A protein has these predicted regions:
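A short helix-and-adjacent loop within the catalytic ATP-binding
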Residues: 25-27, 50-60
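Short flexible loop/turn segments at helix-to-beta-strand junctions
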Residues: 27-37, 72-74
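A conserved beta-strand-to-alpha-helix junction within the catalytic ATP-binding
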Residues: 33-48
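Conserved catalytic submotifs in the C-terminal HATPase_c
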Residues: 60-71, 105
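A conserved short beta-strand within the histidine kinase catalytic ATPase domain
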Residues: 96-107
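Glycine-rich/acidic phosphate-handling loop/turn and adjacent ATP-lid/helix
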Residues: 107-134
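Conserved glycine-/histidine-rich ATP-lid loop and adjacent helix of the Bergerat-fold HATPase_c
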Residues: 133-145
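C-terminal end segment of the histidine kinase catalytic
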Residues: 142-174
Length: 174
């Protein structure tokens, strides 16, 4: 008998496998029928805003998801690379969005996820994040990104940092 948890795993696997197809679809044609897809669209907008700042000013950018979620003025002007979306998507969908902090400088974006406060929450978050990291690593390495993962502190912060490996990864317009 299939459970809701099994259905979520199948759905996530399907989405990750089809990320390249999704990335080739023009932003305006994306459907927003489920909460996860709405969240993904928001992630795309957030990263377009971040990348624009990083390209123009070459300054560090650091934002809390809660602050961004309330900003309705962010506009997406072009497609963000699939690797960025995939990594952020698996992290956000596995833990509560306000527990994700991301920052960027030059060609590197960092994602930091904090575990829950209770022991039971921490254990559950740790298991979910383990799955998320595995999926993200597989995907990002398959499209040519170097990925570094580290843990630090008593709060069990989990940082996932990536930057383009050697040469730039081709985007959907190439």
């Amino acid at each position: 008998m299939r459970t809701e948890k099994d259905d979520r795993k199948v759905e996530k696997s399907y989405l990750i496998e089809n990320w390249l197809t999704l990335n080739k679809t023009p932003f305006s044609q994306w459907k927003t029928e489920t909460q996860h897809k709405n969240l993904l669209l928001m992630c795309l907008e957030i990263f377009e805003e971040m990348e624009t700042e990083l390209r123009k000013e070459k300054i560090p950018v650091k934002m809390d998801f809660r602050e961004i979620a309330e900003d309705k003025e962010i506009l997406c002007t072009c497609q963000v690379q699939a690797a960025v979306c995939a990594l952020f998507y698996v992290l956000v969908c596995e833990i509560h969005p306000v527990q994700v902090l991301f920052s960027g400088k030059d060609q590197t974006l960092s994602f930091t996820a904090t575990g829950g406060t209770g022991e039971t929450e921490r254990k559950a978050d740790s298991e979910r994040l383990g799955t998320s990291r595995w999926l993200a690593l597989q995907y990002l390495q398959s499209v040519g990104y170097d990925v570094k993962i580290s843990r630090s502190g008593k709060k069990e912060l989990i940082s996932v940092t990536f930057q383009t490996a050697g040469k730039a990864v081709r985007n959907r317009y190439d």
